[in-house]
Amino acid sequence: MSLAVLLNKEDKDISDFSKTTAGKSAKKNSRERVADVAPTRVLDKKQAYLSQLNSEFNRIKRRDSIEQLYQDWKFINLQEFELISEWNQQSKDWQFDNTNDSQDLHFKKLYRDMSMINKEWAEYQSFKNANLSDIINEKDADEDEEDDEDELEDGEEDMEEDEASTGRHTNGKSMRGNGIQKSRKKDAAAAAAIGKAIKDDQTHADTVVTVNGDENEDGNNGEDEDNDNDNENNNDNDNDNENENDNDSDNDDEEENGEEDEEEEEIEDLDEEDFAAFEEQDDNDDEDFNPDVEKRRKRSSSSSSSTKLSMNSLSLITSKKINKNITINSDRPKIVRELIKMCNKNKHQKIKKRRFTNCIVTDYNPIDSKLNIKITLKQYHVKRLKKLINDAKREREREEALKNNVGLDGNDLDNDEDGSESHKRRKLNNNTANGADDANKRKFNTRHGLPTYGMKMNAKEARAIQRHYDNTYTTIWKDMARKDSTKMSRLVQQIQSIRSTNFRKTSSLCAREAKKWQSKNFKQIKDFQTRARRGIREMSNFWKKNEREERDLKKKIEKEAMEQAKKEEEEKESKRQAKKLNFLLTQTELYSHFIGRKIKTNELEGNNVSSNDSESQKNIDISALAPNKNDFHAIDFDNENDEQLRLRAAENASNALAETRAKAKQFDDHANAHEEEEEEDELNFQNPTSLGEITIEQPKILACTLKEYQLKGLNWLANLYDQGINGILADEMGLGKTVQSISVLAHLAENHNIWGPFLVVTPASTLHNWVNEISKFLPQFKILPYWGNANDRKVLRKFWDRKNLRYNKNAPFHVMVTSYQMVVTDANYLQKMKWQYMILDEAQAIKSSQSSRWKNLLSFHCRNRLLLTGTPIQNSMQELWALLHFIMPSLFDSHDEFNEWFSKDIESHAEANTKLNQQQLRRLHMILKPFMLRRVKKNVQSELGDKIEIDVLCDLTQRQAKLYQVLKSQISTNYDAIENAATNDSTSNSASNSGSDQNLINAVMQFRKVCNHPDLFERADVDSPFSFTTFGKTTSMLTASVANNNSSVISNSNMNLSSMSSNNISNGKFTDLIYSSRNPIKYSLPRLIYEDLILPNYNNDVDIANKLKNVKFNIFNPSTNYELCLFLSKLTGEPSLNEFFRVSTTPLLKRVIERTNGPKNTDSLSFKTITQELLEVTRNAPSEGVMASLLNVEKHAYEREYLNCIQRGYHPNVSAPPVTIEVLGSSHVTNSINNELFDPLISQALSDIPAITQYNMHVKKGIPVEDFPKTGLFPEPLNKNFSSNISMPSMDRFITESAKLRKLDELLVKLKSEGHRVLIYFQMTKMMDLMEEYLTYRQYNHIRLDGSSKLEDRRDLVHDWQTNPEIFVFLLSTRAGGLGINLTAADTVIFYDSDWNPTIDSQAMDRAHRLGQTRQVTVYRLLVRGTIEERMRDRAKQKEQVQQVVMEGKTQEKNIKTIEVGENDSEVTREGSKSISQDGIKEAASALA
């Protein structure tokens, strides 16, 4: 029971208290009288009341401690299942050890702990049954705080041991069953005793009599309410713990208790509501109030000290709960924390402000036995308290006044008070007659008549408090009856069901534990079996592991043996392959050596064979060996030695030579089968085997003189023909390969009477060149040009379709010239012929062995094949193999072997600068020398000038750099991969065969477009505004309109046709339509507005004011300012004074025109000044020609330098003439507007006079030309740029937006001034279109040749370039204009963009650097720094190095100059000796002018 209940109850019963204590208060009308109160009596009443109140508090404390003991007992019972489960788990841990000694130790420890626990439990039971108050009273009251804390700690340790002993007491063994039952009986007895004590105490509380009759009874009821609430909260907390423990236990048996989960959730919901009510607290802002708190503390010190220890110990017991994760051996503070968490789980504090007066014991100090009480008053009680304090103050003042007032009679006052009190007492006795029996039963009686908290109140206030309390009391009980009763009933039922379930589980666990002891022997047997199985399993695993290790070791040994055998086999195979390679090389070398001695290639090239080579081959003569073909796959390379293999190689070489000779002889026999018998003696002359080693002179039928090296080439070709061997004439471009091949044909015709048929296959661009060369050097040969459309070729095929056709001097044709495309198209017809000699010009066209032209040409029947090429190797060694296999299929039959021999080493040397195997290179040269003849210009042609190569490096412009970065960001493939693809060897050949490679090449092409010119992506368009205009019609349209009677066209022509006749229109005399455009909008101005606003009137005086200003206020008017005009006349010599007035009123533009036209009055000598004479001479000068240019040098220079640079700053989007305004009945407005806009004098001066008008003026009207009005005053550049709103793309911007074009523009100016003629090579025809626009803008004479040019046009273009020196630039595509044509008229070659293949560029530049060139040739190559073009150029240098290594055996140093052009167009020139085998360009000190 709390003090708040007592206070609230006192408010209720204050009226009864006032009735029973009539002497305590007076009537309402006599309250102002002063009463003499005995101080001693009042103090006695207060002391009695306070002692009574303290006794009540002591009784409440005792009852609460007993209740806490009871709750503690319930908590222990509800936690048994969880504790037993934990003990079972620990008992299982003891059974892990299989030794009996460990078991005995565990059991001995268990027995020892159980005995100690029984002893502690007995002490605890005696402690609970003892009278705690007597025990505490025996304690020393003056003991210090440290001793009290020690006692509390001892009590906590005892309780911890009690809990642990309770846990261990129920653990494990069946022999402890009796002890468990006994302890439970003791607990049940103690719980019964506690319950009985609680009931007795409650009954005793009901019988207690307090002050003011029913006051204490109601107070007890209120106290019971609080105790009930506390008990409910404690029960709720216990139920929470029970539910949590049950949830933990139910997790082990989910199948049995699955239906109890929903019930537990409902319990948790109920607990949350109850816990919120339990946790309610008072406002912290209210002040504590107790009038006699010090006295109460003194009075309650003795009684409260008796219950101090019990309250502390029991509060610790109720706050400790066992967590399922805490073992019985855990520390007590840890267990306490876990129990607090369990109690507060899922609880939410809900603080509600009390609506009634409350009193709570906030603190109790056991040292000085002080009890702190917090009283929270509601608003009404606060006001009442203030009023009582004021009344007490006034009471004291009255008492002091009474002491000082001697005139008053104290006895009268006492009588009056006694009378009033007796009257009130009688009234109270009548009202409380029914409750007299109950009052007699009360223990205490009130005699002091004071309020419960020592204050007074009247009956009205007491009744108000009573009503308020009744309403609150009724509301609380209604809420409890409506909400809490059903909850508590369900909660009790659930607790009972859970408890029964826990009991059942506990019993089952106990039975299970009992059975474990009975099945001990069985478990030992089972353990033996388990151990046996485990041993067998471990043994099996051991043997398996042992076998696996042995197997792995055996496999390892076998693997090592196999690897060793494989290694030995690889070494053996490598030796075998080396022998095979040596065999093939020896075979080829012997064949080449024999042929080389026959045809003397070394002597023709100017080289001598080394002594080692001669020494190595002198022992074997393949001509003396019997031809025997040894199958390459049948040779045993393992058993035969090197000498035997060498002999077999010699036999194969002899066999190859015999087959070649037999083939040539068979071809000759078949060709001469139809000869007459008397010519049989000449067969030996034509037989190649009997010609012998002779020196061939130049054929007489050859209409030219061969140079010395060309005559040697003729001898070499003749020897090849005699031996029946094919060859490659690989002289450097420009040394006359064409004339040497023609001389061979002349040699065969003159010396061997072999007139054909000969086949010449050449690129399409050189067809006419070959025809011209053959007809020029061999006029006796009949040429068949085989090209054209299908019908033309069908007619040409009739020449060789004749039966028994014999080729002699009178044959229909001797040489057929065709292109590679025609060979592929008409291969079926050409294969039927047997050709004596087939010449392939620009043989790099068949560099791919997979192409259709290579396969078709290889299938042709011909005695000898001659390949003409200046670059036998362009990209890789595979191209060289393709040419060698074409001329010698029997020797060079496998590309893989050739690649294994030479390609890998040489190409890797060129790419990575690795060391080259000189022996291997020497053998390659030995193989190639008999079949290939190559001379370079510097060795054989001393009169040919040098060739200087200059690389011009430019930086990207701003627009190009942005486009380049955008392309790099949009391409998903890595940019480095694209650059590698750009530099790949097979890029130009096989890229189209692969989709991925083609995508990369397309990406590369986009980057190259950016480097060339950004306009290759998008051109700037012509910009013009929208014209909202009706245009005038020309004469042809008017003629058609008159013929068709189309009045609409004539009416819209804006021309006055009244003076025109149909004859004039038909003759076409009227063609001047200047200012003929009109606005489609016409506006008719009302006449009323025109008269009021435009015509002069009293409202509109604008015209009058202007006239008045120009006449009256003009200082140059002679009538108003005569003296000034006279003074000016004397100064200027002007006789007329009105002339000043006229000049001042004439517009400035008209005055300029009049002054330009010169003086009108030529009779006046005063105007014959020098200035007028000059003007007259200038005016009479012709408008065009040398004289006009000389007279207007300054004007032309000014216009060219300044006016041409002026461009429009604003371009309108729409243009329209002024709206036409008409006034009905008046033409003044229209005429004034037209005169203002289209003044005839100004229009005539700014524009030119039409030719027909000039004719009419001079011829028909007889006006001299010198009297024609001055025209064309508006400068031509301004007239071009500002006379129309149409904006053309700026050519200056077009030039400056490309780095290459800007540099080329500067370069061409320099070359033009120095008299050079330029060849410019391109890769893109679209770029050639842009270049033509540029050359037209700069007015350079140029011609163009590309792949779209026709054959006959190509011949004419080359002829014009060679013969017409006025042509400054020749635009060519590298593929079409770089082969087989002679362009020696040019001495400068510019590569705007380079080709994939460096040899293509080399052939293109040799179009100018060849025989016939007398000047030094300079080659410029435009490159963009930091782009993909640099990567392509580096790769091209590597390819050139491969060519140099293969053809000459070493790298050739070339003089290269590099010009670096920066952003400010400054040039940094570097010149030095550049070795192709080195990366980069070495800087030099010299600069290029």
From Swiss-Prot:
ATPase component of the INO80 complex which remodels chromatin by shifting nucleosomes and is involved in DNA repair. Its ability to induce transcription of some phosphate-responsive genes is modulated by inositol polyphosphates. The INO80 complex is involved in DNA repair by associating with 'Ser-129' phosphorylated H2A histones as a response to DNA damage. Residues 393-402 have a biased composition (Basic and acidic residues). It catalyses: ATP + H2O = ADP + phosphate + H(+). The keyword Transmembrane helix does not apply. Residues 140-164, 214-291 have a biased composition (Acidic residues). This is Chromatin-remodeling ATPase INO80. GO terms for cellular component: chromosome, centromeric region; chromosome, telomeric region; Ino80 complex; nucleus.
